[in-house]
Amino acid sequence: MTGEAVSGQDVSNPGKSSWRVTVLGGGAWGTALALAMLRAGHKVRLFARDPQTVAAIGQGQNPRYLPGIAIAPGIEATSDIAAALSGADCVLAVTPAQSLRATLAVAKDNMPDGIPLVLCAKGIERDTGALLSAIVEEILPRNPVAALSGPSFATDVARGLPTAVVVAARDEALAADLAARFSAQNLRCYSSDDLIGVEIGGALKNVFAIAAGAVTGAGLGASAQAAMVTRGFVELRRIGAAFGARPETLMGLSGLGDLLLTCSSAQSRNFAYGLTLGQGKALAGLPLAEGVPTAAIAARIAVERGIDAPIIAAVAAILDGAITISQAVTALMTRPLKTETND
């Protein structure tokens, strides 16, 4: 086995007992978070549907999703959902946003009552427009819901590089407890009781990451990139306010922080998708980009709620094939002039 060794031991949290943490999802982010939980001193099980992924993790690697990173022993991987959830103290849901409902439906009968379920995916459900926390509350009403979000690439977390995220729950005490239990030497977890704000920031930044990638791919320049990200954040705040998100949450790690990271690196699937789009290359075969379904949903929400969100609308129209990038730029640049802060 080759690759960069990743230790399963780091630092446990003083005064916090070890938990049995179950991770639902064997992709790059699920595997990275499993390693992070291991470093925080917890016993970790990982559920993946793909038997090959389960076998690979058992052999200390996940070449399909985290190539080049050797995973130290300690993560118990399984494709048996009942075994994965048995005796769990906490569950991290790391399946794609559009698959969450189906995953929870499968997990429902084996989910221990009362344990927290932490959302680690970012998005809005395509068919219903529901935030992911609403799906959890519908399917698992006896399990408190939380969300982990912030500027974090899977490879960085898997390698144990310094990273800061936020853990949010409506119950402030639960959020603080989860943040303390998840934190380790190079993973700093802040807490928040603004669950909706954290979810909105994480979902919408994916749309602007596609736009950022398209701007770069089309060669529109650094000035256009900066303008798009800045005005995109204005739209994020507008939609966040309509959902009741607090402004300070959107200015934090899960909003502005994640937006800056995702809009500046091809490590982001959404940026990479937009980059390919801007270059005029074929999109077939690219990894899942959550911003694609989210763009259409966010554009619809903006229209329904009377929110001015021209960048989101442009991204949705480009992805739908209704307009070209050039046409979108012209439309955005010729909008009626206004005061910058007139929201």
Swiss-Prot record:
Alphabetically ordered keywords of this record: Cytoplasm, Lipid biosynthesis, Lipid metabolism, NAD, NADP, Nucleotide-binding, Oxidoreductase, Phospholipid biosynthesis, Phospholipid metabolism
GO terms, molecular function: glycerol-3-phosphate dehydrogenase [NAD(P)+] activity; NAD binding
Gene Ontology annotations of biological process type: carbohydrate metabolic process; glycerol-3-phosphate biosynthetic process; glycerol-3-phosphate catabolic process; glycerophospholipid metabolic process; phospholipid biosynthetic process
Active site: 205
Binding residues annotated for NADPH, in chain numbering: 29, 49, 122, 154, 269, 288, 290
Matches recorded under InterPro entries: 6-PGluconate_DH-like_C_sf, 6PGD_dom2, G3P_DH_NAD-dep, G3P_DH_NAD-dep_C, G3P_DH_NAD-dep_N, NAD(P)-bd_dom_sf
Main EC class the enzyme belongs to: oxidoreductase
Summary of the function given for this chain in its UniProt record: Catalyzes the reduction of the glycolytic intermediate dihydroxyacetone phosphate (DHAP) to sn-glycerol 3-phosphate (G3P), the key precursor for phospholipid synthesis.
NCBIfam families per the UniProt record, alphabetical: PRK00094.1-2, PRK00094.1-4
Matching HAMAP family: NAD_Glyc3P_dehydrog
Classification via PANTHER family: GLYCEROL-3-PHOSPHATE DEHYDROGENASE, GLYCEROL-3-PHOSPHATE DEHYDROGENASE [NAD(+)] 2, CHLOROPLASTIC
Protein name per Swiss-Prot or TrEMBL: Glycerol-3-phosphate dehydrogenase [NAD(P)+]
Source species of the chain: Mesorhizobium japonicum (strain LMG 29417 / CECT 9101 / MAFF 303099)
